[in-house]
Design a protein with these regions (language model features):
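Residue-level recognition of well-ordered beta-strand positions that form the cores
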Residues: 85, 157-159
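A general structural signal for short secondary-structure boundary/capping elements
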Residues: 87, 131, 178-181
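Short, intrinsically disordered/low-complexity patches at protein termini
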Residues: 16, 105-107, 177-179
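Broad, structure-driven detector of short, well-ordered beta-strand segments within folded domains
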Residues: 82-84, 142-143
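Signature of long, low-cysteine stretches enriched in small and polar/charged residues
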Residues: 102-155
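N-terminal targeting sequences that direct proteins away from the cytosol to non-cytosolic compartments
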Residues: 19-80, 92-95, 100, 114-115, ...
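Sec-dependent bacterial lipoprotein signal peptides
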Residues: 1-19
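Terminal, regulation- and interaction-focused segments at domain boundaries
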Residues: 40, 85-88
Length: 182
């Protein structure tokens, strides 16, 4: 009796352990810890604009021959770059500049109806704009435009230097949204 119980238990154990069907494991991602926000004045003085810049961002001036006022802000530890472009405008060309910006935003999204827009207004400084947040697996989840409606138009687009995965990049996107709003 004892021996048959041992054989039955051993047989059941062998059946449970000898399973040959592969069970896939979920893919793991590294935890991304953005640094604490800290800001300084833009260290480039010959631009037609100024703003506060994260201490973690590196300013890259484009090669000679690119339009004046264009800069890139690189976050090497986050593998992200913010491409910024500047255009002198007139009140007559403001509408066209805004429409081009919106068209570029829509082109980046698979689902244009999911684009969220947040308006920005600082009447004391005469600065107005929009922040566009793209849902899903977009390579450029944040884009923005700023203008004084008279002579300056500034546009920025954030790009990841990796395959976008909105869930795993969400902490970085939140951090950079805070930097852009600052």
């Amino acid at each position: 009796m004892r021996m048959s119980t041992g054989i039955v238990c051993g047989g059941l154990l062998a059946l449970c352990v000898s399973c040959t069907e592969y069970t896939p494991k979920p893919r793991g991602y590294f935890r991304i810890e953005p640094p604490a926000p800290s800001y300084q004045a833009l260290p480039v003085g010959d631009l037609p604009y100024t703003f506060r810049l994260s201490r973690w961002a590196e300013v890259e001036l484009p090669p000679v021959g690119n339009p004046a006022g264009w800069i890139n802000l690189s976050y090497p530890q986050l593998n992200v770059k913010l491409y910024c472009s500047y255009f002198p405008i007139t009140p007559a060309t403001l509408g066209r500049a805004e429409e081009e910006c919106r068209a570029l935003v829509v082109r980046q999204s698979k689902y244009p109806e999911r684009i969220k827009m947040q308006a920005y207004s600082n009447p004391e400084a005469s600065v107005y704009g929009s922040l566009f947040m793209l849902d899903g697996e977009s390579a450029s989840p944040l884009q923005f435009m700023l203008t004084d409606s008279v002579s300056h138009f500034f546009r920025g687009a954030l790009y990841y230097d990796c395959i976008p995965n909105a869930d795993s990049l969400a902490p970085v996107t939140r951090y950079l949204k805070q930097d852009i709003v600052e």
